[in-house]
Amino acid sequence: MVSKLSQLQTELLAALLESGLSKEALIQALGEPGPYLMVGDGPLDKGESCGGTRGDLTELPNGLGETRGSEDDTDDDGEDFAPPILKELENLSPEEAAHQKAVVESLLQEDPWRVAKMVKSYLQQHNIPQREVVDTTGLNQSHLSQHLNKGTPMKTQKRAALYTWYVRKQREVAQQFTHAGQGGLIEEPTGDELPTKKGRRNRFKWGPASQQILFQAYERQKNPSKEERETLVEECNRAECIQRGVSPSQAQGLGSNLVTEVRVYNWFANRRKEEAFRHKLAMDTYNGPPPGPGPGPALPAHSSPGLPTTTLSPSKVHGVRYGQSATSEAAEVPSSSGGPLVTVSAALHQVSPTGLEPSSLLSTEAKLVSATGGPLPPVSTLTALHSLEQTSPGLNQQPQNLIMASLPGVMTIGPGEPASLGPTFTNTGASTLVIGLASTQAQSVPVINSMGSSLTTLQPVQFSQPLHPSYQQPLMPPVQSHVAQSPFMATMAQLQSPHALYSHKPEVAQYTHTSLLPQTMLITDTNLSTLASLTPTKQVFTSDTEASSEPGLHEPSSPATTIHIPSQDPSNIQHLQPAHRLSTSPTVSSSSLVLYQSSDSNGHSHLLPSNHGVIETFISTQMASSSQ
């Protein structure tokens, strides 16, 4: 017995008195048990009690089918709620209606959470979706889900509607399996009456037992035959019957949950589509764009993967490897007269034989066009180099590039670091680079070098005597099989105030003795008078015959022709001799003279460094030239 009123009860009494109701009328209304009991059974079912209704708790379950007018009849939003399933009890026979009311009243007296778990288990056992419960009872989908899954409190009127549906559904399912062989249902008119309200039918839903059987079959065979599908139908229906606690012979009682051959076929087709989609998604993710910033491949197809990268000096080479383009740098060579003398800005590039085809010698990036002409075409008709690799951005941005084109021989002079090129190119006069283009036929191909503020002058120098090598030393044994065999003579000379010439002999075996060095291109910077002093001379040297580094290749002893430029200081004349190292200098610049050799022949190219350690240069292992 409650001695004091709660705050809510006090507010309710105050509201009744303020509405104009007198105390006498209120007491008289409380003294009338009939109407008040039917109105107040909802709150009292939850344990709430008022002064005059404490002794009426035992009468709460009665009158479930009667009309109620308390706050229990309203929803959470305050709207009136009248479960339609409760009104349908009037359509049943008196015996059936009395039986259902008795069962529902017994469920209302039990723990709501225990009954909710029982209803949820029944839904899962028979693969009944909650949508069917919502359509039949008119309950809120979210409220029903929370009540069944979390035990959220539900008003008595709504629970009575849920329990009424539960009792009726049990009776319908039992009748289905009992009369499965007859193909008819006793409660069919009542069952059809409910779904027609929204014009919807129960959707087929795969049960856990059937899914387990189908997934095991999918692992064995992703596309079963018709006979295999029919076997799976029997297994699934048997499992569904066992799950529901009935005999497999009553499989027709599954109703809308009956497994058919068409449904099994659709299930396998959907699984195959899902697997194909996941595979495609995985392949798209795997074959996506690489995170690296480089747009081009790191190594071309014709590069040698076995070439050791440690052959270059790691102290000077910054990321320069065989088959890779180096970063473009600009080296300003100081001069004694003040100011930079020569600026060389060209990266080391590998030229493939396919890049030297006549159809691929046009370069729009270099703003040069090629045209056929006489022995010495004009400067405006120069051709540029092409390579399979994409050129670095720094190369396209700098206009001071040494562009050379020769069929079949091409080479490029790359930039050097100031620390390494400084001692080499420091002079008081103009500097000149002499590049030899070796081929079996005399050609006159112009070379332009727009370095600094002056235009380079081009002039070929013809040599009638061929050069015969007496030395052949391998440069890099791991890549000898990838290096082509072709004649080549490259001479790089630096003309200081007293001119000095650096020359070397080619290391090519089995070449023709005619027209080996038909011409040499001279690239001068500022002093054009130095061209007049260049005179070809012949010096004969006799040496013993040395065997080639490759078996089966021998060279006879023969005179060798060198290029001599008169110099005021003979001590500055340097000669490049063959060696096994890239350079005799302890520090080798990553940018210098590069020789390229095509891969369709079997020769070898070598490095001939300076004996005095003045020139810091290296020669690569490829020359785009074919002289077979």
Curated annotation (Swiss-Prot):
Tissue specificity as recorded in UniProt: Liver.
Biased composition (Pro residues): 288-298
UniProt keyword annotations, A-Z: Activator, DNA-binding, Homeobox, Isopeptide bond, Nucleus, Phosphoprotein, Transcription, Transcription regulation, Ubl conjugation
Region: Disordered, residue numbers: 47-79, 183-205, 284-338, 541-585
Residue numbers bearing the Phosphothreonine modification: 74
Maturation and modification: Ubiquitinated in s SPOP-dependent manner; leading to prteasomal degradation.
HNF-p1 domain residues: 1-32
Stretch list, region Interaction with DNA: 130-132, 143-149, 155-158, 203-206, 263-265, 270-273
The family this protein is said to belong to: Belongs to the HNF1 homeobox family.
Cited function: Transcriptional activator that regulates the tissue specific expression of multiple genes, especially in pancreatic islet cells and in liver. Binds to the inverted palindrome 5'-GTTAATNATTAAC-3'. Activates the transcription of CYP1A2, CYP2E1 and CYP3A11.
Protein's UniProt name: Hepatocyte nuclear factor 1-alpha
Species for this entry: Rattus norvegicus (Rat)
Lineage: Eukaryota, Metazoa, Chordata, Craniata, Vertebrata
